[in-house]
Amino acid sequence: MGDPRKSKKKWMGPSHPWIKINLGKEQILIGKYGLRNKKEIWIAQTMIRNFRHQARSLLALPPAERNIREKQLIQKLYRMGILEKDNSTLDDILSLTEENYLERRLQTIVYKKGLARTIYQARQLITHGHIAISGRKVTSPGYVVLRGEEDLIDYYPTSPFKQNPPSQGEVNVEQA
């Protein structure tokens, strides 16, 4: 487990946070995915940066070892749902963006499944304990949903939303 006093942070912020182009992109992502702050974007960027770094380092390995590790990395990203196809290549990993990671957050998937009317309501339902994955309550909107868990997302069994879900109306999935 490790010593709790020696924990590392999961993200690395920008070296210069006030670049105008990046500010605009970050604001769009915050609105599109209902994020609370830019740290959540930086976590996604760091995760994708690490995956891309692993892919680049694989290119330097001998072909025999490279093929084994390449398959392992592709399988991991496929199980996480970040890669769409099981037979992806390193080029697909190198072309990943932070949006690929943000699409796999529990908050986004709850909204896209229609369990919440808005992306912000999805965040609130999760933090208030109304959402479960295979019957287990998950209260972190940033939880990365694995491909196998996606169909198991539902309301928590004792949640009042289980019997009376929020009225759906028109949910525009393309806009969010």
Swiss-Prot record:
Q: Name one GO molecular function term.
A: rRNA binding
Q: Name one GO biological process term.
A: ribosomal small subunit biogenesis
What are the GO cellular component annotations?
A: small ribosomal subunit
Q: Which residues form the S4 RNA-binding domain?
A: 104-166
Keywords from the named record: Ribonucleoprotein, Ribosomal protein, RNA-binding, rRNA-binding
Among InterPro entries, the record links this protein to: Ribosomal_uS4 (IPR022801), Ribosomal_uS4_arc (IPR022802), Ribosomal_uS4_CS (IPR018079), Ribosomal_uS4_euk/arc (IPR005710), Ribosomal_uS4_N (IPR001912), S4_RNA-bd (IPR002942), S4_RNA-bd_sf (IPR036986)
SUPFAM superfamilies xref list: Alpha-L RNA-binding motif
Which NCBIfam families does UniProt cross-reference here? PRK04051.1 (NF003139), uS4_arch (TIGR01018)
Function recorded in the entry: One of the primary rRNA binding proteins, it binds directly to 16S rRNA where it nucleates assembly of the body of the 30S subunit.
Quaternary arrangement and interactors, per the entry? Answer: Part of the 30S ribosomal subunit. Contacts protein S5. The interaction surface between S4 and S5 is involved in control of translational fidelity.
Entry's family note:
Belongs to the universal ribosomal protein uS4 family.
Instruction: Spell out the protein name for this chain.
Output: Small ribosomal subunit protein uS4
Origin species, per record, is Sulfolobus acidocaldarius (strain ATCC 33909 / DSM 639 / JCM 8929 / NBRC 15157 / NCIMB 11770)
Q: What is the lineage of its organism?
A: Archaea, Thermoproteota, Thermoprotei, Sulfolobales, Sulfolobaceae
